């Protein structure tokens, strides 16, 4: 039905009461026993109707799913935005069904997208509320049809709403509170983006609707339509526009969570975000580095690079390492505690790769990086490319939940600094440098920790690498100087922020050796040499209590779990995009440690069973020979 001002007044009153309640619980803990389930999830998604709640839960239980995502979008469909009663009842039913068997469920809702079912009819969001829409600087509204995205059906109107459209936002938050009242365990917010990701909008830096422009002017005194040079990182106005857009999305998601926990203090908020560490983050305005402290988990539909096929079956070996770098970064952004859910796709018709093989390599790679697994059929959120394989993977993860749901404390005396502001303003330069340093460390089996502006003051390692970090606040620069004053070695590559010019003892590599190495690996991964930049490697490498002798195509992450030192290994040897996603088995992997870690090694291969390897004393060290490594393994000392 058309939106009425009478209904708006009622909603506004409820909203005001809700915000009072939300303020009372604003200090709600993000972590704790009530949210421990989020580190244990093995995810699958199901379309929810008014009649299929029990069947969804039955199917989920049968394949080992824990943490059921259901699709029954209320605010993302204009009709249910206005009248949510039927969908709210369906959500209540699936929550009851999931809880009856000890499972958890959370419901999908759109962020800033809203679809009206009849684009030609009079009752669409765009027709009734054109002032709610995001717009290009030219005034063109963010309104689309079926040709723009696969999820838009013929005859539907798809629009993207400004988060500053206050009447819409009031209704939206009321719907959030109603959803929280159903007993569902979480709200899964998809695509909370500024419209910059559909064809023709990539460089728009939207939105320039009246409400957004007014909010920016109030905050900065600048007219976004006239006073900024879009795309110019040297322009202070454009930098303010980038920061404003990111902060707006942060505030939107934080408000969703406040409203949800006001009704149900145990409610979880999980945004789905596809940009990771790359330039898409400032472009769409959803920066996972900034979002992790504000939400309970992030579901990363993580992909990057050119082309449309980012499935596991089509990944190059270089890609596999870049995904490791991304996932390790996400874990650091969440302080290693907030769960990282990875919605990646294993296979979508690659003729030379078996779906099961791609699924296994993908799942193994995510587990060793500390992420939760979510694979689906093709490029949709639901289904599976091979249900028996998914069932096998999920049951194995469940059997070893004590390992894969535990909080990890990464080990390593080398720290690599992630600068969100540098990435926001100079993404190409920073990301290449950051990846180059981390790839060099990974392939040389040097353990590292990712350091962020939020964890810099606590970093107690020996070496801190700043890869082309061009933008630091005074506080951040002071933190780097304090690290050096404590005896730490600071390594600066590329262009460093001028605030570090006075650091005479810093080791500098202004000619970008890390980027040279990255480019060689990108061009021919197997022919590139991770020791080809010896001066840089010597400057950033540090020793560890554990030394691993293995192929450079084997990734090793060292961490402490519950007081025990563990190694997580992933094998990417022999992989070829679109041809082979089954790694070549690795033999003769040796691990050398000091005696204090013990002389017994436990080895748990991916999808296998635990076995014990006894170490051989060799002077002051103990040496272990691992059994053949297929895809991945976890090992720990005793």
Language model features: what each stretch is:
Residues 45-62, 166-179, 280-290, 355-363:
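Short, acidic/polar
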Residues 1-13:
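Bacterial N-terminal signal peptides that target proteins for export
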Residues 250-268, 274-275, 292-638:
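Carbohydrate-binding surfaces of carbohydrate-active enzymes
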Residues 51-76, 181-186, 297-298, 362-373, ...:
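Catalytic domains of carbohydrate-active enzymes, especially glycoside hydrolases
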Residues 167-294:
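Active-site neighborhood of glycoside hydrolase catalytic domains
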């Amino acid at each position: 039905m058309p939106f009425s001002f009478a209904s708006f007044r009622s909603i506004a009153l409820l909203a005001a009461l809700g915000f009072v309640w939300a303020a009372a619980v604003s200090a709600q803990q993000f972590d704790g026993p009530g949210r421990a389930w989020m580190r244990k999830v093995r995810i699958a998604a199901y379309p929810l109707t008014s009649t299929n709640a029990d069947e969804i839960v039955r199917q989920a239980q049968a394949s080992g799913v824990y943490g059921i995502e259901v699709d029954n979008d209320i605010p993302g469909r204009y009709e249910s935005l206005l009248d949510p009663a039927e969908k709210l009842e369906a959500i209540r039913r699936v929550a009851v069904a999931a809880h009856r068997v000890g499972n958890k469920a959370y419901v999908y809702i759109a962020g800033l997208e809203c679809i009206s079912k009849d684009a030609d009819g009079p009752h669409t969001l765009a027709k009734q509320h054109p002032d709610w829409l995001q717009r290009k600087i030219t005034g063109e509204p963010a309104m689309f049809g079926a040709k723009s995205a696969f999820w838009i059906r013929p005859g539907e109107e798809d629009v993207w709403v400004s988060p500053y459209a206050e009447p819409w936002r009031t209704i939206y938050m009321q719907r959030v509170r109603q959803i929280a009242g159903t007993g569902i365990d979480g709200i899964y917010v998809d695509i909370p983006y500024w419209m910059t990701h559909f064809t023709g909008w990539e460089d728009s830096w939207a939105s320039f609707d009246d409400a957004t422009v007014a909010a920016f002017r109030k905050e900065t005194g600048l007219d976004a339509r006239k006073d900024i040079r879009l795309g110019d990182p040297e322009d202070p106005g454009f930098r303010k526009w980038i920061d404003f857009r990111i902060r707006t999305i942060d505030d939107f998601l934080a408000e969703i969570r406040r409203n949800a926990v006001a009704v149900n203090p145990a409610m979880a908020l999980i945004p789905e975000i596809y940009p990771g560490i790359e330039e898409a983050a400032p472009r769409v305005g959803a920066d996972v580095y900034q979002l992790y402290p504000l939400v309970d988990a992030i579901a990363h539909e993580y992909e990057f690079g050119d082309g449309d096929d980012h499935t596991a079956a089509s990944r190059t070996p270089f890609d596999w390492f870049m995904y490791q770098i991304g996932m390790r970064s996400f874990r650091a952004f969440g302080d290693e505690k907030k769960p990282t859910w990875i919605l990646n796709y294993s296979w979508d018709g690659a003729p030379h790769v078996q779906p099961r093989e791609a699924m296994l390599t993908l799942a193994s790679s995510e587990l060793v990086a500390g992420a939760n697994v979510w694979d689906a059929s093709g490029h949709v959120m639901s289904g599976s490319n091979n249900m028996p394989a998914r069932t096998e993977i999920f049951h194995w993860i469940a059997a070893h939940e004590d390992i894969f749901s535990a909080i990890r404390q990464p080990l390593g005396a080398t720290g690599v600094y992630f600068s969100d502001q540098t990435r926001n303003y100079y993404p190409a330069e920073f990301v290449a440098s950051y990846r180059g340093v981390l790839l060099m460390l990974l392939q040389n089996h040097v353990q590292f920790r990712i350091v962020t502006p939020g964890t810099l003051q606590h970093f107690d390692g020996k070496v801190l690498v700043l890869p082309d970090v061009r933008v630091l606040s005074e506080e951040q620069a002071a933190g780097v100087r304090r690290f050096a004053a404590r005896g730490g070695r600071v390594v600066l590559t590329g262009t460093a922020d001028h605030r570090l010019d006075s650091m005479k003892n810093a080791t500098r590599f202004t000619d970008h050796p890390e980027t040279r190495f990255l480019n060689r690996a990108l061009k021919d991964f197997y022919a590139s040499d991770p020791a080809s930049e010896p001066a840089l490697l010597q400057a950033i490498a540090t020793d560890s209590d554990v030394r691993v002798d293995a192929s450079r195509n084997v990734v090793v992450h060292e961490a402490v779990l519950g007081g025990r030192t563990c190694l997580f290994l992933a094998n990417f040897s022999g992989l070829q995009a679109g041809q082979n996603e089954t790694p070549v088995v690795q033999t003769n992997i040796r691990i050398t440690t000091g005696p204090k870690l013990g002389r017994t090694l436990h080895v748990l291969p991916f999808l296998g069973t635990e076995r014990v390897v006894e170490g051989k004393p060799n002077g002051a060290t103990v040496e272990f020979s691992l059994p053949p490594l297929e895809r991945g393994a976890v090992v720990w000392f005793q």
